[in-house]
From Swiss-Prot:
An example Gene Ontology CC term for this record: cytosol
CDD domains: TMPK
Tree of life domain: Bacteria
Annotated InterPro entries: P-loop_NTPase, Thymidylate_kin-like_dom, Thymidylate_kinase
Binding site for ATP: G10, I11, D12, G13, A14, G15, K16, S17
Pfam families: Thymidylate_kin (PF02223)
E.C. no: 2.7.4.9
Presence of keyword Oxidoreductase: no
Alphabetical GO biological process terms: dTDP biosynthetic process; dTTP biosynthetic process; dUDP biosynthetic process
Enzyme class label: transferase
Protein name in UniProt: Thymidylate kinase
Catalysed reaction, written as an equation: dTMP + ATP = dTDP + ADP
Keyword tags: ATP-binding, Kinase, Nucleotide biosynthesis, Nucleotide-binding, Transferase
């Protein structure tokens, strides 16, 4: 059985986590093995890098490099092996978040992010070679990317209200509203650039309505009954 790689995107407060858990239960009820993971993170090394990225001050290039370093380890140790096994991989954020937060939010060069994406996410040595050899050439033809990205689209103003008093914010959650407006625009731009991969969900709706919309995306693809 072929593996499925599904990512979930949206600004903080959009409600991704609840629906990721619901989808994991739905896939398991159909007998599928599920790998639940997140970014930055997903491995011991990547979780250490996550803590640095979320809490330590650094320049934008350092931040981007740490995120992609965490992503490479995550791909090598978790995502690629799970896909080879035939698992359904449900990942809370992936590269689209980097383009939205670091690119649109921080104003980091999108061309540099695209180059890092090509290098780090090359499928050479991951889906075919268990050794995970790194491709020592810049011309990478294919990259590992989600089969589907579920984007929980929520206005930044509404997200801010949901997060009030929820927890101590990390350095991203503590950013001003204008930052999240740029991030939301970044997600919209990514959807427009990859319409075949993105499924936009109106996350402003009641939770049960959002869940039905999410589930219907998977039913329509024949992945859930």
């Amino acid at each position: 059985m072929h593996g499925l790689f599904i990512s979930f995107e949206g600004i903080d407060g959009a409600g991704k986590s609840t629906h990721i858990a619901g989808l994991a239960d739905a896939f398991r009820a159909q007998g599928r093995a599920v790998t639940l993971t997140r970014e930055p993170g997903g491995t011991p090394l990547a979780e250490k890098l996550r803590d640095l990225v979320l809490n330590d001050a650094m320049d934008s290039l350092t931040e981007a490099l740490l995120i992609f370093a965490a992503r490479r380890d995550h791909l090598v140790r978790v995502i690629a092996p799970a896909l080879v096994r035939g698992d359904v991989v449900l990942c809370d954020r992936f590269t689209d978040a980097t383009f939205a937060y670091q690119g649109a939010g921080r104003g980091f060069d999108l061309a540099v992010l695209a180059t890092l994406e090509q290098w780090v996410q090359s499928d050479e040595g991951l889906l075919g070679d268990p050794a995970g050899n790194f491709p020592m050439k810049p011309e990478v033809e294919t990259v590992i990317e989600p089969h589907l990205t579920v984007w929980f689209d929520l206005p930044p103003e509404e997200a801010a209200l949901r997060l009030q008093g929820a927890r101590v914010p990390d350095k991203f959650e503590a950013q001003p509203l204008e930052f999240f407006r740029r991030v939301a625009k970044g997600y919209s731009d990514r959807q427009q650039g990859h319409p075949e991969r993105f499924a936009r969900i109106n996350a402003s709706q009641p939770r049960d309505v959002v869940w039905q919309a999410v589930r219907q995306v998977f039913v329509a693809k024949g992945w859930l009954a």
